[in-house]
Amino acid sequence: QKTAYDITTRLVGSELCIRDRAYFWRGESNYRLDRFPQAGNDYRLYLEFATSKDGQEYGLALYNLGYTYFKQKNYGNAGTWFTRFVGRGSANERAMQADAYNRIGDCNFYDRRFEQARQDYARAVEIDPSLGDYSLYQEAFVRGLQRDYNGKVQTLNRLISDYPESQYMDDALYEQGRAFVQMEDNANAIARFNILVKKFPESNVARRAANEIGLLYYQDDKYPEAIQAYKQVIASYPGSEEARLAQRDLKSIYIDLNKVDEYANFASTIPGGANFDVNERDSLTYVAAERVYMRGEVTEARNSFTRYLQTFPEGAFSLNANYYIGLI
């Protein structure tokens, strides 16, 4: 690349018919060396001096100039040059046209012009369906930002059915599950998350999905299913943030169920797991009994406070427990 760059630099001072191509090829050299500001300057000079605007090089200069700005996160100028490129409408550049529409969509997305971005992604998949999985994924994501959750689900269905080997498949399943959550359709959300966890267990989004399965069951008061889901997260992803969150929520479920001893037994089986000391067990056993009382389950509350006092006769909450027993 250094040699090509030196040669084209010497040619820049030549006759106009040679000079424009020299700018183009120096721009190419700079681009491949990741010198995007210099490449952009050369492409602009080529476009200024180009003797023909119909050739492939002219279109490529417009396209690459868009990328020089895009690589520098200058999305306003990037969008301008990509738009000029797609305006050529060349049938011989369909793949590049579709890619340029994706980049225009990205530029509009970053500038929060979501409806325009959605239209750009849709246009990209129309022009060249072979590159459509990215376009559909982005279009669906934008629909979610627009709170068109049903549209998001339908767009992702197209991606899943038309591009079964897509690199975006795991993300598509996760985003589809999230759309169902937003629609308060927990059953379909859980179904999508289960497919994701089964097909892509090592994916980062699979870990999140596995945890959300437990949370959705928990929110629906389906405690046995939530317990099973959270235990699966802890077993499948030990040491992860998702496992930590699952253990936290699992503790809350067992407290709600007034089964602190059962949680303590489970926690003791986790490799490198919870430090479940006497003081915490004291506190959680009392909290579980108090929650039973607050739910109005008087008989169970009396039994729970009595068990607390038997287990922790000098416990931190023994006075409170005796007080509640007196009220009952």
Which stretches of residues belong to each language-model region?
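Single conserved hydrophobic/aromatic residue that forms the stacking wall/gate
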Residues: Q1-I18
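Short solvent-exposed coil/turn linkers within tandem alpha-helical repeat scaffolds
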Residues: S14, R19, Y46-G59, F85-A98, ...
